[in-house]
Amino acid sequence: MFKGVFTALLTPFKNGEMDEVSFRSFIDFQIESGIHGLVPVGTTGESPTVSHDEHKLAVEICIDQANKKVPVIAGTGSNNTAEAIELTNHASEKGADAALVVTPYYNKPNQEGLYAHYKAIAENSDIPIMIYNIPGRSIVDMNLETMNKLFQIKNIIGVKDATSDISRVFKYKSIIGDSFNQLSGEDATTLAYMTYGGHGSISVTSNIAPKLCSDFMNLCLTGKFDEASKINDKLMKLHECLFLEPSPGPVKYAAEKLGLMSSELRLPLVEISKNTKDRVDEAMKFALLI
């Protein structure tokens, strides 16, 4: 069971190449700030625009630099089942604690296809698997029945839910059970998610505010929701501003502002507008980050 806030790590680039020095330093910054776990090469890590070799390298660097201080849930999803199996097995071989596998995007499988996809990955790997349900990006939305069926497969352990439907926390608990690991994939609704019984979150905001996010989550995990709400109030402007333009553009800008890495993105993502930069600056000041 994974609990706490896991950072959906940015992937630093420099002059078109992965910046390993900045990545290792950034991982240290996250761990030293109290973050509970790390998630390399998910959407926030620009997984669609890294090569296979870079994808695998990012996972290897993260596992090596974390050095078992915190768990690593490696992003290994693909809309090609065979590719997802390959990436999942690589993460397992290198020592990841689990794999985060997004629902297939663009080819839009139905519920039977979703079940077959995850079943094949699980049966061909030995690592715990988290389903990543994000219909806003993948178009498909895994329903409760399919998720319940998949949980019967021994190494499928839970979900990162980025649907913003808070009622699903209760539905999953009541139908699938308390042992189904539920992590929020939406920073702005994490407080409500936790009050409904969630176990933690995979966060974008924690890239730039790991201490605030980990303090917030520690309060949630101990049931101190009134105190957690005060920190959430500081973070809410950030939660909103970091998605004013396609992510991770705004959060990479903020990371550069803090001296953590370059804001360099890979096409088709482009530099954010001045208006968005101003909004992010304002939110960072409100959270006392700058």
Give a label for each model feature.
Residues F23, H55, V59, A84, ...:
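A general structural signal for well-ordered alpha-helical segments in protein cores
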Residues N133, N155-I156, R266-L267:
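Glycine-rich phosphate-binding "P-loop"
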Residues E17, V159, V280:
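Residue-level signature of catalytic and energy-coupling elements of molecular machines
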Residues V50-D53, E86, Q111-L114, M142-L144, ...:
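Short secondary-structure transition/capping segments
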Residues G4-P12, F29, S33-I35, T44, ...:
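C-terminal alpha-helical cap/extension of soluble enzyme domains
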Residues E123, R137-F243:
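Catalytic alpha/beta core domains of metabolic enzymes, predominantly
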Residues M1-T7, T11-D141:
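Active-site beta->alpha loop and helix N-cap motifs at the rims of alpha/beta catalytic domains
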Residues S33, L57, I61-A66, H90, ...:
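Alpha-helical structural signal in soluble globular domains
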